[in-house]
């Protein structure tokens, strides 16, 4: 999926509002995913998955940092996310559907925290962005 110039502008503007909260939003999205889609917990058997756990917060920061990296490289997502794609495909072997589930939870989290900025156009752009990130992360599964 190709991001238009308007999509890129919307994604950058929305992510600038996230600011230093990317890790917190990432952790909240993970908690939403674990609650809404309990089968996703199987990838984290060694984690304390309780609300506010240090392990979920740490992984949320990794998610937030990866998305911040992606926002900074909208014109070369495959290059920017290559190592992360390798990790998830070859070492962690995460089922690709889980990226879609996390994307859904990220959109929900952003909508809750950025209600005035989460317009239909921004929602659509963020959805396209997260879909593109998911596609890149699963590209090495083949």
Swiss-Prot record:
<protein>
    <recommendedName>
        <fullName>Hemoglobin subunit alpha</fullName>
    </recommendedName>
</protein>
<keyword id="KW-0479">Metal-binding</keyword>
<feature type="modified residue" description="N6-acetyllysine; alternate">
    <location>
        <position position="17"/>
    </location>
</feature>
<feature type="domain" description="Globin">
    <location>
        <begin position="2"/>
        <end position="142"/>
    </location>
</feature>
<feature type="modified residue" description="N6-succinyllysine">
    <location>
        <position position="41"/>
    </location>
</feature>
<feature type="modified residue" description="Phosphoserine">
    <location>
        <position position="139"/>
    </location>
</feature>
<feature type="modified residue" description="N6-succinyllysine">
    <location>
        <position position="12"/>
    </location>
</feature>
<dbReference type="InterPro" id="IPR002339">
    <property type="entry name" value="Hemoglobin_pi"/>
</dbReference>
<keyword id="KW-0349">Heme</keyword>
<dbReference type="GO" id="GO:0004601">
    <property type="term" value="F:peroxidase activity"/>
</dbReference>
<dbReference type="Pfam" id="PF00042">
    <property type="entry name" value="Globin"/>
</dbReference>
<dbReference type="GO" id="GO:0072562">
    <property type="term" value="C:blood microparticle"/>
</dbReference>
<keyword id="KW-0597">Phosphoprotein</keyword>
<feature type="modified residue" description="Phosphoserine">
    <location>
        <position position="103"/>
    </location>
</feature>
<comment type="subunit">
    <text>Heterotetramer of two alpha chains and two beta chains.</text>
</comment>
<dbReference type="GO" id="GO:0019825">
    <property type="term" value="F:oxygen binding"/>
</dbReference>
<comment type="function">
    <text>Involved in oxygen transport from the lung to the various peripheral tissues.</text>
</comment>
<dbReference type="GO" id="GO:0020037">
    <property type="term" value="F:heme binding"/>
</dbReference>
<feature type="binding site">
    <location>
        <position position="59"/>
    </location>
    <ligand>
        <name>O2</name>
    </ligand>
</feature>
<dbReference type="InterPro" id="IPR009050">
    <property type="entry name" value="Globin-like_sf"/>
</dbReference>
<dbReference type="GO" id="GO:0031720">
    <property type="term" value="F:haptoglobin binding"/>
</dbReference>
<dbReference type="InterPro" id="IPR002338">
    <property type="entry name" value="Hemoglobin_a-typ"/>
</dbReference>
<feature type="modified residue" description="Phosphothreonine">
    <location>
        <position position="135"/>
    </location>
</feature>
<feature type="modified residue" description="Phosphoserine">
    <location>
        <position position="4"/>
    </location>
</feature>
<comment type="similarity">
    <text>Belongs to the globin family.</text>
</comment>
<feature type="modified residue" description="N6-succinyllysine; alternate">
    <location>
        <position position="17"/>
    </location>
</feature>
<dbReference type="InterPro" id="IPR050056">
    <property type="entry name" value="Hemoglobin_oxygen_transport"/>
</dbReference>
<feature type="modified residue" description="Phosphothreonine">
    <location>
        <position position="9"/>
    </location>
</feature>
<dbReference type="InterPro" id="IPR012292">
    <property type="entry name" value="Globin/Proto"/>
</dbReference>
<feature type="modified residue" description="N6-succinyllysine">
    <location>
        <position position="8"/>
    </location>
</feature>
<dbReference type="GO" id="GO:0031838">
    <property type="term" value="C:haptoglobin-hemoglobin complex"/>
</dbReference>
<keyword id="KW-0813">Transport</keyword>
<feature type="modified residue" description="Phosphothreonine">
    <location>
        <position position="109"/>
    </location>
</feature>
<feature type="modified residue" description="Phosphothreonine">
    <location>
        <position position="138"/>
    </location>
</feature>
<feature type="modified residue" description="Phosphoserine">
    <location>
        <position position="50"/>
    </location>
</feature>
<feature type="modified residue" description="Phosphoserine">
    <location>
        <position position="125"/>
    </location>
</feature>
<keyword id="KW-0408">Iron</keyword>
<feature type="binding site" description="proximal binding residue">
    <location>
        <position position="88"/>
    </location>
    <ligand>
        <name>heme b</name>
    </ligand>
</feature>
<dbReference type="GO" id="GO:0005833">
    <property type="term" value="C:hemoglobin complex"/>
</dbReference>
<dbReference type="InterPro" id="IPR000971">
    <property type="entry name" value="Globin"/>
</dbReference>
<dbReference type="GO" id="GO:0005344">
    <property type="term" value="F:oxygen carrier activity"/>
</dbReference>
<keyword id="KW-0007">Acetylation</keyword>
